[in-house]
Amino acid sequence: MFTLKKSLLLLFFLGTINLSLCEEERNAEEERRDEPDERDVQVEKRLLPIVGNLLKSLLGK
């Protein structure tokens, strides 16, 4: 009975570690997918004031 409990505990422990590693890998993949969108937002934030100032100077306002 004691050997069975040790085996089950070991399986549970290894399964928990495996699940944790899978979640970390999935989170890393999601972060990699999110990066281009964040870059686009950063480019828009930098580009919009420049375009706005250019239009103001061209229109003379």
From Swiss-Prot:
Swiss-Prot/TrEMBL GO biological process terms: defense response to fungus; defense response to Gram-positive bacterium; innate immune response; killing of cells of another organism; regulation of defense response to virus
Leader sequence segment: 1-22
Swiss-Prot/TrEMBL keywords: Amidation, Amphibian defense peptide, Antibiotic, Antimicrobial, Antiviral protein, Cleavage on pair of basic residues, Fungicide, Immunity, Innate immunity, Lipid-binding, Membrane, Pharmaceutical, Secreted, Signal, Target cell cytoplasm, Target cell membrane, Target membrane
Modified-residue entries (Leucine amide), positions: 59
Localization annotation: Secreted; Target cell membrane; Target cell, Target cell cytoplasm
MF term (GO), any: lipid binding
Tissue specificity remark: Expressed by the skin glands.
Highest taxon in the source lineage: Eukaryota
Prosegment location in residue numbers: 23-44
Record's keyword annotation contains DNA-binding: no
Use in biotech settings: Has potential application in preventing device infection by S.epidermidis biofilm, since it has the ability, in combination with EDTA, to eradicate S.epidermidis biofilms on silicone catheters.
A cellular component annotation (GO) from this entry: extracellular region
Task of the protein: Amphipathic alpha-helical antimicrobial peptide with potent activity against Gram-positive bacteria, weak activity against Gram-negative bacteria, and moderate activity against fungi. Mainly acts by causing membrane permeabilization, but is unable to forme pore-like openings. Is also able to penetrate eukaryotic cells (keratinocytes), and kill intracellular S.aureus (both wild-type and MRSA) without injuring host cells. Shows inhibitory effect on biofilm formation of Gram-positive bacteria, but not of Gram-negative bacteria.
Subunit structure: Homo-oligomerizes in membranes as homodimers, homotrimers, or even homotetramers. Oligomerizes in presence of LPS. In Gram-positive bacterial mimetic membranes, the aggregation is weakly pronounced, and penetration proceeds more rapidly and is deeper than in Gram-negative bacterial mimetic membranes where aggregation is high. Homo-oligomerization is prevented by temporin-L.
Record-stated family: Belongs to the frog skin active peptide (FSAP) family. Temporin subfamily.
Protein's recorded name: Temporin-1Tb
Native species: Rana temporaria (European common frog)
